[in-house]
Each structure stands twice: as structure tokens, then as C-alpha cells.
Amino acid sequence: MFTLPSRLAPLVLQNKKILYDLLFRTSADTLLEVARNPRHLGAEIGFFTVLHTWSQKLKIHPHVHCVVPAGGLSPDHTRWVRSRDNYFLPKKVLQEVFRGKFVDALKQAFQNGQLIFQGDLKLLAQPNIFATWLRPLYRQDWVVYLKRPFGGPAYVLQYLGRYTHRVAISNHRLVSFVDGQVTFRWRDSADHNKQKPLPLSVDEFLCRFLLHILPQGFVRIRNFGFLANRRRKTLLPLCFQLLGSAQESQAKQHLASTEDAPGLWRCPKCGGPMKVVERLTPAEIQLRSPPRVTAAA
């Protein structure tokens, strides 16, 4: 997950499209560049990214979730490169590269006249003031969060799937509307994720809600690397093929080292010996239905 510093929030609200585009582009370029480096993974990765703009209290909090497999294609596309156990890419390197790429892209957008400055931000339209305003961004650590999914890949997809076509808050978090106040639940990460009520005036609630309306036609789910729209048609089947070959090779090594182990190939029901009749690749497993259970005669 890549998060923009809170210092950028006012600028984001006046320049949603350009800054959200920069967030997508620079976070993706960071992952691709660091993963490609032979000192880290040395592979071409593929991933999809989902934009979220809200915090639990509905304040502006732009960040992107990136769902990345633990590996990628070798530079010559002949093998699948696996990441090390419990380690994918160095967090500190990702933070520094992301920070540098985003601030550089922001400076370029300013030089190209793409940014809008209104109200309290009007003075930032002056180059020397904008440059001074940017300096603290170089000195702080930007938030990059890496975590292996607790419940596996399916859980991650289910979690993100709840938000892909919703905005900011779902109905089940709304508690009450009494005397001109809207109360909703929020999770306090500083207090063991306890759920707490937050009462807001109607005006304040609507203001916070409207912060998260995206520009018309904005695409909030994007694919990169070997999942990019123009590349996945050829590269995704190759990934399945290489993943299948790699897993089959590992399975054969495992069988060779354990096939004589006592009781390994015994039926858990009757205790009789079992024999391997077929091995399936991951792609084949996904395409097959589970075996039917036939009733005993």
C-alpha cells in the first residue's frame, strides 16, 4: 500500500485527477523498478492497483492498494522467479523511490502549468513558494506498507472487492440520524481497532462524503506489468505455464525424497496403499470442478 502524506491533502482536493494519476503512475513505477533490480527480485512483476481516498473518519487519505504475486518473470521470460519466504521487496527502498518519483512528478506538473491553486493555496502558484512548500516532503518517511495476506489471496480479493464500486462509507456503518446529527462507526487503529461511534452534523458529514467523489470517468482500478491490458494476453498464459512447470518440478523432487516414507501414500479412510495417477498444474486445477461424491450402493 502506498499512501500520500497528509501535507498533500489540500492540493489533492483541488487537483484530484492529476494527483491521483500521479499516485497510480509513481507507485506502479516504483514497484516495477525495484522488483526489476537484480539486487532485490530481478524479475518483471504484474499487479493490479485499487485507489482508496478515505480514512475511517471519512477524511481525505489517498492511498493505493497493490495486489502483487510473490514473484515474476525472469528478464528473458524463460522462468518464474520466486521471492524469498517472508520477504518480497525492501520497504525502505520502496519508500525512498516512491517519494522521489512522486515529488519529481509533482514538480514537473507544476512546471507544465497543470496544477490549480485556489483559496488558501493561491500563494503556491509562485515558483519559489511552491519549492519551499515541497521541501518538508523530502525529509519525511512516506508510508509504504507491505504485508503478506492474513487469509490468503482469496481474502485480499474479497476485501478489496467490497470497495471497488463503493464510495467512502457503506450503509452498515451508519448508526443513527437524530437531531441533525449523523452517527457512524469507525475503527480506531490506535486502540486495537475498536469500533467507536462518531457523531457529525449533517453538513460536516456531507462535506466529508463529497471529498471522495472522483472526477467523471476516472478509472480507480488499474493493471500494470505483465497484467497490463496490452501485455497480459501473451504474458499471463506464459506465467501460468512457468508456474505450472515450477510447481511440478518441486512436486517431483518432493516425491523422490519422500516416496519411501512409511504411511505417506496410505488412504486416510481404509489405510490401503495409494498410487499417483495424474498431476495437475495450477491452471488445470482452477478449470476443473471438484469431484462428485457418489452414494454407496
Task: Outline where the language-model segments fall.
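Beta->alpha loop/short-helix hinge microenvironment recognizer with preference
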Residues: 1-297
